[in-house]
């Protein structure tokens, strides 16, 4: 019995030894995998550096590099692959290109940088995309990373600003191509200081140039807005002590085409039951519409269907009597404030023919108010002042 009890600790020790041996094997396998991954990464790094050094790749080396990239993506290094690519491969390669021309100035710098860009854009960049083809579909892409590193390490770390500012500088076409291509690459964090520095270089070779904060031109002053809005409500309601200036607005001639007036289609059933059965169905009849002056309000057609304009009556003015037979009242019956708004010769196109129906008259005048032959308008009425004088114009802005 004692021998059996004495042998039991030995059996448990055997189990522990087996577990320890298995753990050691696993650790050894992990170390071997890491060593293999490191060897694969070193081979990829050597291949990429040789491309930057104009040595090229050996036969079938591109295929082996593709397989190495696929293997690395399956290991624990896969999640850090982009970081390794930026901090090691691309940074080292760009430093190799920069060190060859970093001490040049003036015209020699422009010519040397043009040659460097041609080599990078035509040879290095396609080869990088081929080597890291298995990484495609991830953001940022290999192309974006390579161009961003070229911008930050080479373009913005040379005396390029001084070279472009010289009066007799001859800018090679490759320099303009380089700046415009780099300008089209954006980072996920938005506009950065490096991007703004790049735009300051583009202004020296491209004029006019539409940048992030406006239009740059050598012949005209800087325009502070690339999307110019003509805000009528600010011209109507200026703040105290503020001087407003009108920005130059370039309008498209296509906005000056005559507008289409809607056709009022009558439904007999609703007309009998409710007294008004108008619905807008289609468009016809080309009509040139002039902008209706602000201030006309409360146009009524008859006692059964009353449609009011988007204006406000002057204080103390009573409700006007209804108008019959689809005609407007004569101008001498209007109040003094309204007579100043109308002129028989100036506003004659706004007054419809007497034979028109009341509904068509109202539709035409509403369309003339809501439309403007000068441009496209967006309604921002909620964010404006609710002053009665500006109720019609206050919610309209012309967008160019």
UniProtKB/Swiss-Prot annotation:
Associated component of the mechanistic target of rapamycin complex 2 (mTORC2). This is Proline-rich protein 5. It comes from Xenopus laevis (African clawed frog). Pfam families: HbrB. PANTHER family: PROLINE-RICH PROTEIN 5, TARGET OF RAPAMYCIN COMPLEX 2 SUBUNIT BIT61-RELATED. Belongs to the PROTOR family. Residues 301-358 are annotated as: Disordered. Residues 348-358 have a biased composition (Low complexity). SUPFAM superfamilies: Cullin repeat-like (SSF74788). GO terms for biological process: TORC2 signaling. GO terms for cellular component: TORC2 complex. Residues 334-347 have a biased composition (Polar residues). InterPro entries: Bit61/PRR5, Cullin_repeat-like_dom_sf.
């Amino acid at each position: 019995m004692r021998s059996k009890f004495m042998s039991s600790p030995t059996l448990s020790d055997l189990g522990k030894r087996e577990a320890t041996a298995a753990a050691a094997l696993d650790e050894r396998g992990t170390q071997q995998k890491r060593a293999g991954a490191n060897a694969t990464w070193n081979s990829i790094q050597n291949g990429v550096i040789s491309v930057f050094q104009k040595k090229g790749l050996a036969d079938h080396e591109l295929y082996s590099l593709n397989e190495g990239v696929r293997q690395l993506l399956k290991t624990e290094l896969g999640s850090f692959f982009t970081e390794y690519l930026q901090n090691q491969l691309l940074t080292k390669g760009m430093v190799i290109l920069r060190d060859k021309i970093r001490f040049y100035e003036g015209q020699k710098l422009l010519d040397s940088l043009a040659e460097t860009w041609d080599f990078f854009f035509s040879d290095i960049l396609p080869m990088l995309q081929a080597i890291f083809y298995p990484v495609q579909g991830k953001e940022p892409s290999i192309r974006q990373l390579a161009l961003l590193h070229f911008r930050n390490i080479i373009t913005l770390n040379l005396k390029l600003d001084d070279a472009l500012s010289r009066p007799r500088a001859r800018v090679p076409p490759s320099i303009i191509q380089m700046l415009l291509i780099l300008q089209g690459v954006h980072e996920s964090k938005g506009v950065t200081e490096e991007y703004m520095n790049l735009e300051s270089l583009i202004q020296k070779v491209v004029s006019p140039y539409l940048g992030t904060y406006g239009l740059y031109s050598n012949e005209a002053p800087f325009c502070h807005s690339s999307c110019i809005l003509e805000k009528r409500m600010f011209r109507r309601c200026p703040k105290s002590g503020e001087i407003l200036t009108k920005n130059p607005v370039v309008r498209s001639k296509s906005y000056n085409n005559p507008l289409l007036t809607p056709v009022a289609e009558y439904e007999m059933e609703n007309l009998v039951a409710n007294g008004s059965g108008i619905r807008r169905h289609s468009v016809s009849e080309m009509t040139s519409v002039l902008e209706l002056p602000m201030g006309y309000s409360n146009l009524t057609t008859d006692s059964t269907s009353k449609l009011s304009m988007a204006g406000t009556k002057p204080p103390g003015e009573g409700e006007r009597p209804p108008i019959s037979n689809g005609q407007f009242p004569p101008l001498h019956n209007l109040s003094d404030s309204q007579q100043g708004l109308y002129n028989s010769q100036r506003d004659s196109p706004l007054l419809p023919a007497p034979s028109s129906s009341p509904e068509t008259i109202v539709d035409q005048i509403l369309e003339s108010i809501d439309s403007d032959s000068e441009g496209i308008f967006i309604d921002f009425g909620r964010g404006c002042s609710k002053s009665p004088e500006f109720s019609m114009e206050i919610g309209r802005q012309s967008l160019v």
